[in-house]
Amino acid sequence: MPQHIAASDLRLTWPGAISTEMTDDRVMPWRIPYVERNLFAKELVEKAAMPAGVRIRFQSNTSSIEGFCNSFPERSQVDLLIDGGYVASAVTQNKTTFRFEDLGSATKTVELWLPQVGEFRFEGMNIDVSAELSEASTNASPKWITYGSSITHCSGADSPTTTWPAIVARTRGYDLTCLGFGGQCHLDPLIARVIRDREADLISLCLGINIYGGESLSPRTFGPGIIGFVKIVREKHPTTPIALLSPIFSPGREDTSNAVG
């Protein structure tokens, strides 16, 4: 019989998650404070339920991992990293289990990068019957928070480690918190509060395309909206570098006014 590790086991950490919701034997990572989700726009809540950039992290000498989760119709893969290196991906769409084998018996830091698309409720995992498991050492990497639209959410990427925030974080050695919300980057003050209240060494904000497409801010309110958002973040990050980015080039939008200008 394998050794079962409960989803709520405190030796498992959840880097990249803003909060975790525990129900029965499941843990669902959120990218907003889930207890306050009724305060957020419902469209944003839907995207925040997708664990882009969230990892389950632990240390073990197990040679196999069998994970359990809810079934979900449209969901990307789980990626396995060992000691920071990519090992394999597992399909999770319409599945309740995923498995990785032949991992060797050495003690290693394991990271399960969760799907950037689709709701994911973790229901625990099986490891080798005699394997040891402990909390991984504290990640001392610089902490990076990135906020943006679908450009940052990267729902079209093949797997969670092939999104551009994941590639940058792994290449540069950053501890990633991804707040990319497809179609929902509208300078919500509640998101500014989330960023404000989270530890960060670098913050990047990619702004504009959803505001243009959704016509949510006008020439009168766009600039003040950015300033207000940054001012909220600065309340607890007075000296943290903040990079303000425009979206990637978008033909058809560059010289065309929307309904609010």
Locations of the language-model features?
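An acidic- and aromatic-residue-enriched active-site/binding cleft used to recognize and process polar
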Residues: Y174, F181-Q184, G208, P247
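Alpha-helical cap/lid subdomain in secreted, periplasmic
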Residues: A49, G53, P189-G261
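N-terminal secretory targeting modules
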Residues: M1-K143
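Serine-esterase "nucleophile elbow" of acetyl-processing enzymes
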Residues: G85, L103, V110-G182, P189-E199
